[in-house]
């Protein structure tokens, strides 16, 4: 789980606010609390047009200054007639900028422009067939009867003046509407979700045909602009980066090294909770193959001592996080003066902290929050850097594309998510050297068998968990009393929800047989068939 901590500074930290933005077509998504707002932005970027998510409180004047080619109003959990329902600035309709309202966004548009919205006689949730009344404009190349995803309890009962009906469903008379003259559009369904078969075509129609955008948001353009901006900002100063081996920090290291070379120093803190052979492979890869300087810090004994006797998972995270800060502080001081701290902040982190990071007078970020792969409390007060955050406009899938384009090896680009506290939270209960060794060996077998069959990219995550109990078994003619290992293999698009993977029985059999026979201290292997929700992907 990613968490954030506040970085104390003497002045407002400097960030690369405009990396990846510059002078290109922009689509703004105003967020009304929808779980899909980020997904809308991702879908637009997949069409090679840049998009950003902003609060529904953004004023029409602020939008005018941003000069977007189009505006999308997201869905949300509220009813437009609710006492505390969020409302946008009504002057938005007069900007002359195309607007697309999605679900709640459509209802809000109708409500503010003089139409009527009421509680539906029957809510509509899940898949629905969309019947097209006007196949032009927004619905060009969207097939009649195509599937769209519905999730609403209110419906439009009367369109505002100037609007026409574009489409309906069996239970929703006004499923898509438009005021063609003012370029105002509304859809009651969610075109951004994967279940909406014609959704991508609709989004492309809005972005390209209605908003008249050009495909300028490309990986190559981002890399070129990011490198130029890094060089301009950093100059001849030194930059420090905490390298974890994940795709975010590795891509950041590659990008920075291309921009400023040996002005970059990477610090890799080996806390002893990584998978088998991983620390050695990572350091060798960066130092010998990529020739990027890495300061390796072996702090295994320190971290193990910090979690000795601890069984509560949150306390384990807290102690690991605090010790990481201590080691990082000591290392940075030993290596000399650095002006900048490179931070692998991604766009979802920016969205989550947007309301707390803006100065009410200027709109500038004044209290930057630092993403950490540990559950940490805060950096030391005398550890002061300016920030370099070149990836802060990117989603995870875009980071992978950037990493691949600048030469990051596929084993890192496609690395499955791995928690910051590492194996310490895949060992339930107390972490000991014995348990770490057992879990490392079992986890290695899982990864070997998955990789050998070319199945690694089929899963969001595939790993082993060690339970702090003993089970009875029989090996040879003797009874055993040893640990059980849990296999956790899931499929997912983004980690927010997940399903247990239907791994072939013969693969599970090989994994189980190898673990029981090759890993001393294990006599039982079980398979976790719990989805998320109700369970989580990790066990702690």
From Swiss-Prot:
The active site is at 103 (nucleophile), 190, 192. Its EC number is 6.3.5.2. Disulfide bonds: none annotated. ATP binds at residues 244-250. Transmembrane segments: none annotated. One of its GO terms (molecular function) is GMP synthase activity. Residues 217-415 form the GMPS ATP-PPase domain. Pfam families: GATase, GMP_synt_C, NAD_synthase. PROSITE patterns: GATASE_TYPE_1, GMPS_ATP_PPASE. Keywords: ATP-binding, Glutamine amidotransferase, GMP biosynthesis, Ligase, Nucleotide-binding, Purine biosynthesis. Residues 26-216 form the Glutamine amidotransferase type-1 domain. Pathway: Purine metabolism; GMP biosynthesis; GMP from XMP (L-Gln route): step 1/1. GO terms for cellular component: cytosol. It is an enzyme of class 6 (ligase). It catalyses: XMP + L-glutamine + ATP + H2O = GMP + L-glutamate + AMP + diphosphate + 2 H(+). Homodimer. Catalyzes the synthesis of GMP from XMP. This is GMP synthase [glutamine-hydrolyzing]. The lineage of its organism: Bacteria, Bacillati, Cyanobacteriota, Cyanophyceae, Nostocales. The gene is guaA.
């Amino acid at each position: 789980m990613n968490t954030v901590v506040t970085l104390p500074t003497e002045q407002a930290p400097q960030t690369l606010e405009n990396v990846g933005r510059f002078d290109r077509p922009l689509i703004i998504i105003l967020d009304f609390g929808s779980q899909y707002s980020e997904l809308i932005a991702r879908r637009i970027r997949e069409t090679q047009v840049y998009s950003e998510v902003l609060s529904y409180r953004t004023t029409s004047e602020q939008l005018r200054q941003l000069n977007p080619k189009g505006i999308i109003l997201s869905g949300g959990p509220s009813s437009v007639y609710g006492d505390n329902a969020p409302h946008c600035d009504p002057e938005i309709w007069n900007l002359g900028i195309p607007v697309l309202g999605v679900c709640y966004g459509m209802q809000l548009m109708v409500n503010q422009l003089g139409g009527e919205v009421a509680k539906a006689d029957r809510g509509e949730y899940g898949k629905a067939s969309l019947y097209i009344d006007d196949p032009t404009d927004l619905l060009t190349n969207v097939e009649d009867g195509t599937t769209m995803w519905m999730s609403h309890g209110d419906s439009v009962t009367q369109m505002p003046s100037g609007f026409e009906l574009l489409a309906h469903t069996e239970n929703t008379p006004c499923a898509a509407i438009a005021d063609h003259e003012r370029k105002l559009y509304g859809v009651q369904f969610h075109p951004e979700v994967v279940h909406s078969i014609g959704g991508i075509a609709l989004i492309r129609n809005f972005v390209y045909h209605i908003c008249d955008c050009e495909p300028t948001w490309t990986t190559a353009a981002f890399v070129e602009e990011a490198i130029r901006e890094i060089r301009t900002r950093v100059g001849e100063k030194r930059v420090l980066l905490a390298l974890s081996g994940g795709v975010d920090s590795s891509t950041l290291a590659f990008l920075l090294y291309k921009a400023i070379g040996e002005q970059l120093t990477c610090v890799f803190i080996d806390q002893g909770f990584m998978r088998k052979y991983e620390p050695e492979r990572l350091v060798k890869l960066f130092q010998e193959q990529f020739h990027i300087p890495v300061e390796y810090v072996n702090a295994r004994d320190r971290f193990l001592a910090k979690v000795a006797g601890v069984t509560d998972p949150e306390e384990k995270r807290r102690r690991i996080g605090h010790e990481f800060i201590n080691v990082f502080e000591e290392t940075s001081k030993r290596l000399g003066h650095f002006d900048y701290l490179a931070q692998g902040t991604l766009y979802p982190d920016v969205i989550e902290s947007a309301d707390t990071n803006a100065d009410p007078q200027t709109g500038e970020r004044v209290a930057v929050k630092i993403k950490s792969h540990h559950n940490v409390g805060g950096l030391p007060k005398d550890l002061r850097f300016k920030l370099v955050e070149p990836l802060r406009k990117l989603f995870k899938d875009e980071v992978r594309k950037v990493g691949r384009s600048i030469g990051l090896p596929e084993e890192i680009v496609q690395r499955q998510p791995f928690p910051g506290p590492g194996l310490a939270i895949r060992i339930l209960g107390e972490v000991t050297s014995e348990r770490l060794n057992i879990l490392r060996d079992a986890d290695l077998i899982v990864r070997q068998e998955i990789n050998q069959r070319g199945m690694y990219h089929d899963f969001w995550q595939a790993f082993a968990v060690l339970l702090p109990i003993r089970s009875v078994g029989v090996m040879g003619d003797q009874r055993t009393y040893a640990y059980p290992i849990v296999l956790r293999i899931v499929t997912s698009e983004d980690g927010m929800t997940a399903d247990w993977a239907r791994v072939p029985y013969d693969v599970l059999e090989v994994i189980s047989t190898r673990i029981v026979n090759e890993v001393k201290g294990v006599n039982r292997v079980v398979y976790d068939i719990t989805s998320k929700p109700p369970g989580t992907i990790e066990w702690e």
